[in-house]
């Protein structure tokens, strides 16, 4: 399966309503978010406006730790955005549901203010009840305190 097709299928799966998540999707806004998929070298990543999410597909040979370091750096350089990792060789789960794409190294970029509003809205629902506290802290970082547990 080609990269773009694989990623589009992953996004489709993230948008499926899951009974084991109380009827929520892994990513409740995935089905309505505008996005673009950009294949590039990790060092060439720069913000791209006009989309809810920019999905950067970066080098496969990067380790999860390499991807983490790049994400940390990008978050420092571009504080108005949130960059999140999806490392190919690091599976992530909410309960028993695998949330990562499982094949490509991806860095996702979203507008920080808009993402924070969505997280806050979800925090007023039982959505985050299905997340482990560790995963919640890892993903939400500074927004962790916004979420009412």
Question: Each predicted region: which residue ranges?
Answer:
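Expand to "…catalyze enediolate/carbanion chemistry for C-C bond making/breaking, isomerization
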Residues: 1-149
């Amino acid at each position: 399966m080609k990269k773009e097709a694989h990623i589009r299928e992953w996004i489709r799966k993230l948008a499926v309503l899951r009974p084991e998540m109380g009827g929520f999707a892994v990513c409740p806004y995935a089905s309505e978010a505008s996005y673009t998929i950009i294949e590039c070298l990790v060092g060439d990543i720069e913000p791209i406006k006009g989309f809810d999410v920019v999905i950067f597909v970066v080098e496969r040979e990067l380790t999860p730790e390499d991807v983490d370091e790049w994400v940390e750096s990008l978050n420092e350089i571009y504080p108005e955005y949130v960059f999140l990792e999806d490392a190919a060789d690091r599976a992530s789960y909410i309960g028993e549901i695998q949330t990562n794409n499982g094949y490509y190294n991806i860095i996702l970029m979203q507008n920080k203010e808009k993402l924070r509003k969505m997280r806050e809205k979800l925090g007023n629902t039982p959505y985050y009840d299905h997340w482990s506290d560790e995963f919640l802290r890892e993903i939400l970082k500074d927004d962790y305190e916004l979420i009412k547990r």
